[in-house]
């Protein structure tokens, strides 16, 4: 059987009531299920379930983007221009770029994780302006963490694991509001990292 490099999209399921779209992909090496929730304008929370060696996203999303990835199971590898990083269970990365990464690699052919993509040209400038004691500005958080580079990785930490563990088990009935709170919590925690 000939190996097809790119996963072929075999189905798209939109659940308007839940506010998400699920994309199903497959090739002779495996499959992937990607569920995208739009949380705020310009902010997506994405559940990734991948069982193949590589995944070409094929996204045309451009702008000033911040990508946050959390690895729950397996391993994900990504190249950002001249930088290369990988995440194992519990690890988190923050990266800045002008367009979505097109290819992710999965050497174990097994990956479950959550991604948060923030397009700062479309998202609110301040996520927490209605809370007087909380100042969360995603672009400033990413610039401080990434410094002069394009990415920042945190190896497995309990406080990061706690935030994401709740995202994997949230009941459907209040997912949308809960996603907003958890993204705000994550950005607040990241803003406190020195």
What spans do the regions from the language model cover?
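Hydrophobic residues positioned within well-ordered beta-strands of beta-sheet architectures
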Residues: 46, 66-68, 114
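Alpha-helical bundle regulatory/interaction domains
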Residues: 79, 86-194
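A generic short-segment signal for beta-strand/edge and adjacent turn/coil regions
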Residues: 13-19, 34-41, 80-88, 133-135, ...
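N-terminal low-complexity or simple alpha-helical regulatory segments
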Residues: 1-62
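Residue-level recognition of well-ordered beta-strand positions that form the cores
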Residues: 49-51, 69-71, 117
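Glycine- and acidic-residue-biased ligand/ion/polar-headgroup-sensing regions
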Residues: 62-82, 92, 120
């Amino acid at each position: 059987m000939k190996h097809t490099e790119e996963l072929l999209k075999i189905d798209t399921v939109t659940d308007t009531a839940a506010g998400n779209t699920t994309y199903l992909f497959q090739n002779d090496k495996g499959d992937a299920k990607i569920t995208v929730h739009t949380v705020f304008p310009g902010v997506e929370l994405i559940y990734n379930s991948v069982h193949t060696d590589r995944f070409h996203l094929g996204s045309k999303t451009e702008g000033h983007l911040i990508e946050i990835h959390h690895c729950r199971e397996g391993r994900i590898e990504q190249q950002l221009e001249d930088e290369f990083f990988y995440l194992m269970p519990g690890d988190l990365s923050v990266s800045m770029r002008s367009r979505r990464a097109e290819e992710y690699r999965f050497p174990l052919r097994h990956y479950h994780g959550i991604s948060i993509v923030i397009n700062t040209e479309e998202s609110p400038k301040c996520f927490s302006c209605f809370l007087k004691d909380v100042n969360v500005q995603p672009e400033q958080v990413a610039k401080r963490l990434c410094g002069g580079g394009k990415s920042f990785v945190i190896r497995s930490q309990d406080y990061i694991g706690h935030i994401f563990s709740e995202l994997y088990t949230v009941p459907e009935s209040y997912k949308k509001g809960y996603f907003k709170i958890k993204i705000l919590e994550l950005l607040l925690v990241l803003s406190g990292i020195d």
